[in-house]
Amino acid sequence: MVLHTGALRHYDAILCVGDFQFEEIRQTEKLFGDPEQELIACGYGQLEKLYDAYQATPREARRRPKVLIAPSWQPDNILDSCIDPLLQELLGQGFDVTVRPHPEYVKRYGDRMNAIVKRYEDYKGGDLFFELDFTGNTSIFDSDTVISDWSGTAYEFVMVTERPCVFVDTPPKINNPDYEKITVPPLEFTLRDQVGVRVSPGSFAGLSEKIRALLQDESYSERIRAIREKTIANFGRSGEVGGQYLIDEIKKQVAARKQ
């Protein structure tokens, strides 16, 4: 859904995040007549780094839950379609709310972002913050929950912190219209109902109560760990797996040259 048609076509081997990508790639090869590639269930090293950093970071007790709004930057994202009614529902409800736009949104649509900030410059509730410094990601993983649309940040938050998210069902980010020709449903669709709750952009009434219920539901942690185990291959040792594959391939090439 995100990768353009042919994006992986010219690789001989692909280190996959998990088995779920195998069937997607195999169906794509057959659909477009591409040669079959070698697929290795490797894992997701960047996610492991984020997880290790999170585990090493001390967490302090806080008086009010932190809610992070972290949208994507595709058309009809949260900032362009529904940020005002969303904030209207959240502010004054006992949360500290931070709006953290995607860096690309600020880069491409700085005037829009400035207009949003300006609309709230006289707000005195003390529970609304705008984060426009993207040099770090501490605020993401220090949050109690994340509200997003189709940003990958939401899934990183879920898999790293083992906490649920709120997904706003804005129009999805579709870079590849051919995705519907593949029978495997995109992971971006299937995980939304499993690791949090979904809400319509025009239906935020009661969202504050839903968030409080999410934060009190301890079953999500175990559920998310199980999903991570099933979805992400070799969690905690992807570097070892990927490195061993490369070493083995080099040995094969060296041996072939000696023949």
List each language-model region with its residue ranges:
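Conserved catalytic-core segment of nucleotide-activated headgroup transferases in glycan assembly
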Residues: I40, Y44-R119, P201-F204, L215-Q216, ...
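Structural alpha-helical scaffold elements that stabilize or flank donor/cofactor-binding regions
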Residues: A7, E60, S139-I140
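Active-site and donor-binding regions of nucleotide-sugar-utilizing enzymes
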Residues: M1-D52
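Catalytic binding pocket for nucleotide-activated donors in carbohydrate/polymer assembly enzymes
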Residues: L8, E36, T145, W150-T231
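Conserved acidic residues
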Residues: D12, P65, F141-D144
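Donor nucleotide-activated moiety binding/catalytic core segment of transferases
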Residues: D111-Y155, V160
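C-terminal alpha-helical cap of glycosyltransferases
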Residues: F235-Q259
